[in-house]
Amino acid sequence: MASNERDAISWYQKKIGAYDQQIWEKSIEQTQIKGFKNKPKKMGHIKPDLIDVDLIRGSTFAKAKPEIPWTSLTRKGLVRVVFFPLFSSWWIQVTSLRIFVWLLLLYLMQVTAVVLYLLMPIVSASEVLGPLCLMLLMGTVHCQIVSTQITRPSGNNGNRRRRKLRKTVNGDGSRDNGNNSPDKVRAVETLESASSVGGFWGTLFGNRIKRVKLVSNKGTETDNDSGCFHPILKKRQGRPEIRMWQAREKAKVSDGEKCRREAYRRLGNGISDDLSSEEDGEARTQMILLRRSVEGASSDNGYEVKNRRSILSRHLNSQVKKTTRWCHIVRDSDSLAESEFESAVFSQGSRSGMSGGSRSLNLSRRDSESTRHDSETEDMLWDDLLHGPECRSSVTSDSEGAHVNTIHSGTKRDPKEDVFQQNHLFWLQNSSPASERVSAIIWEGNECKKMDMSVLEISGIIMSRVNAYEQGVGYQMLGNAVTVGLALFPFLYRLFREKSFDQLKSISAEEVLTLFCGAPPVTPVVILSIINFIERLCLTWMFFFMMCVAERTYKQRFLFAKLFSHITSARKARKYEIPHFRLKKVENIKIWLSLRSYLKRRGPQRSVDVVVSSVFLLTLSIAFICCAQVLQGHKTFLNDAYNWEFLIWETALLLFLLRLASLGSETNKKYSNVSILLTEQINLYLKMEKKPNKKEQLTLVNNVLKLSTKLLKELDTPFRLYGLTMNPLIYNITRVVILSAVSGVISDLLGFNIRLWKIKS
């Protein structure tokens, strides 16, 4: 229905727009209809030394986002909570078995409490409805948090980000080994979460370990030594380039042929510098063909296949040395660092193009190439941090048709969208900031040493300092105290309302039980009261636990910003044991901006924002209810127990929101501290005075600093708590309603009119 309305609107829009057109507009439309397919084109590439505004804004380091609207997520969350046992597999997938059992017990107790209350409506309704509302709220919040995993294809494991591909690949009669029999290969990839990762690489690249296994038809299982098996290459198993890899594994060809078939062309970086001028034309053709294979071109004829095979056979030797260097890194890494290197290096199959058995290559150039190893490894690790997981998870096999049979365990994605993400990954690889280094100063005791460091290395040191910081437990204790108080509140309210201090000294156990139940202590009422107490205790603790997680995340963001602001200060950098460098070169400014954007995007983002948004909306809702109750009758407002409970909730939530608002504001100030750039400009002028011969170069850097200052002022916005700010309409409506209600309450209490918000006409 909605699509028909949109079509009708578009039709009528074009219809009435035709009456406004002149000859020039009609001719332009005809030109646009013809398109640009017939225009001459030539090869181009992205300038790797330039930056985009996305890098300054931070959108270069994209985070996972749900593809389902928030209304659908809210509806699904409510359904999954109401019919909790029916979605047991989903809850186990997104939590764990133990947590699911615990939640199932709470769900069954809540259902029992509702049934008992409907049979005997003796106790207060707020004691039953309070835990029920908390359960619905937290279930909806959790559904929105894990929504990025819901939209992606996943198996039984909730943490798995890749598809399980079951492929049937037919042999090619024109292959060199002459193997014409059909061949089936099943590739199963699993992701495991490491329990604890320490050190620089652990804090920088997360807790992911990748293992790849190849299972043949005979039931034997062979481990891929190097594991360089990219999902895009798996997707193209049926193509001649990938069949070469299968031929080597099964026919056991000679070592010389293995070396020739080990490496594939690297995509996204243009033509290798090692190629001679006579081979440039063929190398370009090879790059175009391989890129087409990655982007999903599935209409290759036999002639094109032959051309690909011949071109590959001519130039594979020139890539053996590069493959050797990558395999070197994998072999020489240690323990957990090795697995982290493998996870990052193997994920770059579309760029490095290594084949599965490349560990058998000659590794004789190890010492002379060690410096280049580090820089190339950082390039790939940086690219993996940018959009690697998203692009890997978006691989589909819609274009393979007869070659590949894929088991889709999730929703289908548009192949054009996948191609766009893959091309976007190539752009990021070409403009990787990790390839550039800055001469930084580090302190080892009382000694000051210089060291060339990249963005990854500097950020890794900063994150290790933040992880070593001892977090406070003040807000955890506050949450626990509020949890116990809210769980015991109905009993304490009845106790102090019906008994005086003198009567409390001689109170009996039967009277305590009666006050605890709020009714004569018969068996169903006692069971209902115990269930309500357990529900209130557990669910309230879970809610404040989520708030403590949000507070911890905001604290870590503040520490990231604090240490980042100390990088250009020699005294502060030495105090906190972080690298120090000055913005005396244009390259240093570029790295400083890249580091700033990278640190701003590190850690949980959307998931924590969902929690804060929900808390913000809950606080505003409670405030609106309290204002309405006061307007209805401020003299009898405190006579009801649920109004007291609302006030306790509002006070606790406001304390947490005040903490989050202060941390967020301080974090924003640290990142938007223009005084750092102004100080560096003063340092440049001081340097000009001492070195007049470098005045032109220093003036250039000074101009770049001025532009950076203007750009940061243009892009940075004041900090706002997530919630209503995400929807301007709801934000404005709520601001008017809440402030108008508060104005009415204050005016009623004080006796004269006070207008906190004026609606402008």
Swiss-Prot record:
Residue ranges of the TM segments: 77-97, 99-119, 121-141, 472-492, 514-534, 610-630, 644-664, 736-756
Low complexity bias locations: 170-181, 347-363
Residues with glycosylation annotation: N179, N224, N362, N430, N673, N732
Keyword tRNA-binding: no
Keyword Amino-acid biosynthesis: no
Record's keyword terms, sorted: Endoplasmic reticulum, Glycoprotein, Golgi apparatus, Membrane, Phosphoprotein, Transmembrane, Transmembrane helix
PANTHER family per record: PROTEIN PHTF1, PUTATIVE HOMEODOMAIN TRANSCRIPTION FACTOR PHTF
Assembly and interaction partners: Interacts with FEM1B.
Protein name in UniProt: Protein PHTF1
The organism of origin for this protein: Mus musculus
